[in-house]
């Protein structure tokens, strides 16, 4: 399938040129955006959308990079966004990494130690939600959510907001940038279906990252392969792009800015959903994508029917977990804790060979097994 797009993000026709909110004095030369790699010729079945989907904004920081992993740095969120002069003194903007409906992402580095970062630039008129962080300081909701999940030591599986700045035109979010790294969409596109040991490792880390977010009162609402960043040196993952996220609550949500092919049937049929079962549904789609090499559903009717077909190489235990996560009724889906206790998660089985046109996945350069 083609790379999917957030429902309400107006895709850009291209990634060249500076963003609307970035002053020309800061705009670097624009090399253009890396092309999205389609997995199949059939476009995603998004209602009211046709043509090839463009990758989501924050996943642009996942362009494969060369270099050595950077040491962890504690995020430093000021009570209010600093201004343009402070940004120019503290950071240098690098090449354009990509452009999407909610903003533009550049490479960059911090002046003091040349630490590589990603700089997400958001136009003020494209901010969908606002929040108050402290002392009545108003900021984009995405900043507040990243702050909440990054407070204290944060979590190794969640991207860190290092800094943020406010200009008359919009906002600049400075995010950590593991190097070298690749998003899970590109990784699967390159490797084909992943082995179950690799999938189990990635999936366990994603579930743990989601648990951390929920413990901090944040629901991501756009869990998908494009928003999973793989540190290619360590074999660890990070959950990125909180632009569709929200504060976690028990009441049903009636808005959704995530990716439709990962959305649950209750949203398709009733335009409402609860955070926890909807999250588990998207995790089921993600796990299917990892072990099968593509997502299970492309059109609304397929989501509603939830009919699953598995290649022969996928083990019965893995199939069973995916079926549990993709149960049509929200009340029938497991909790995050129950997912981690599932037999497939607890008892790795010997894998069957994968017959793929791309060949079996290349052995990873890091230890994934307990």
From Swiss-Prot:
Which segments show compositional bias classed as Low complexity? 1-25
Query: What SMART domains is this protein classified in?
Result: S_TKc
Keywords recorded for this protein, A-Z? Apoptosis, ATP-binding, Cell cycle, Kinase, Nucleotide-binding, Phosphoprotein, Proto-oncogene, Serine/threonine-protein kinase, Transferase
- Sorted alphabetically, which Gene3D superfamilies does this protein's record hold? Phosphorylase Kinase, domain 1, Transferase(Phosphotransferase) domain 1
What biological-process GO terms show up in the record? Answer: apoptotic mitochondrial changes; apoptotic process; G1/S transition of mitotic cell cycle; macroautophagy; negative regulation of apoptotic process; negative regulation of cell population proliferation; positive regulation of autophagy; positive regulation of canonical NF-kappaB signal transduction
Is-annotated flag, keyword ATP-binding?
A: yes
Q: Where does ATP bind?
A: 97-105, 120
Q: What does this protein do?
A: Proto-oncogene with serine/threonine kinase activity involved in cell survival and cell proliferation. Exerts its oncogenic activity through: the regulation of MYC transcriptional activity, the regulation of cell cycle progression, the regulation of cap-dependent protein translation and through survival signaling by phosphorylation of a pro-apoptotic protein, BAD. Phosphorylation of MYC leads to an increase of MYC protein stability and thereby an increase of transcriptional activity.
Record-given protein name: Serine/threonine-protein kinase pim-2
Native source species: Mus musculus
Q: Which gene encodes it?
A: Pim2
């Amino acid at each position: 399938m083609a790379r999917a797009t957030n429902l309400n993000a107006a895709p850009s026709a291209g990634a060249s040129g500076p963003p609307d909110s970035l002053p020309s004095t800061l705009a670097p030369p624009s090399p253009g955006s890396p092309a999205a790699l389609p997995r199949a010729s059939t476009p995603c079945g998004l209602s009211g959308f046709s043509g090839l989907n463009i990758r989501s904004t924050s996943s642009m920081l996942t362009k494969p990079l060369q270099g050595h992993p950077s040491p962890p740095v504690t995020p430093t969120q000021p009570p209010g966004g600093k201004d343009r002069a402070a940004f120019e003194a503290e950071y240098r903007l690098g090449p354009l990494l990509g452009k999407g409906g909610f903003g533009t992402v550049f490479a960059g580095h911090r002046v003091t130690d040349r630490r590589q970062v990603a700089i997400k630039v958001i136009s003020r008129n494209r901010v969908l939600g606002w929040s108050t962080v402290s002392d009545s300081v108003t900021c984009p909701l995405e900043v507040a959510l990243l702050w909440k999940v990054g407070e204290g030591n944060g979590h190794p599986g969640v991207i860190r907001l290092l800094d943020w700045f406010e200009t008359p035109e919009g906002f600049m979010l400075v995010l950590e940038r593991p190097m070298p790294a690749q998003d899970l969409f590109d990784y699967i596109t390159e490797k084909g279906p992943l082995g179950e040991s690799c999938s189990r490792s990635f999936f366990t880390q994603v579930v743990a990252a989601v648990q951390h977010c929920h413990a901090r009162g944040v629901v991501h609402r756009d869990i998908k392969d494009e928003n999973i960043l793989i540190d290619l040196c360590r074999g660890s993952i990070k959950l990125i792009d909180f632009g569709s996220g929200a504060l976690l609550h028990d009441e049903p949500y009636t808005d959704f800015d995530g990716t439709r092919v990962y959305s649950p049937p209750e949203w398709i049929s009733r335009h409402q959903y609860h955070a926890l079962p909807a999250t588990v549904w998207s995790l089921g789609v993600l796990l299917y994508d990892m072990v099968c090499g593509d997502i299970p559903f492309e059109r609304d009717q397929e989501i509603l029917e939830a009919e699953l077909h598995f290649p022969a190489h996928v083990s019965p235990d893995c199939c069973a977990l995916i079926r549990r996560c993709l149960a049509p009724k929200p009340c029938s889906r497991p909790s995050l804790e129950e997912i981690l206790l599932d037999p497939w998660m607890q008892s790795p089985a010997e894998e069957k060979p994968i017959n793929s046109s791309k060949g079996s996945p290349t052995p990873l350069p890091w230890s994934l097994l307990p």
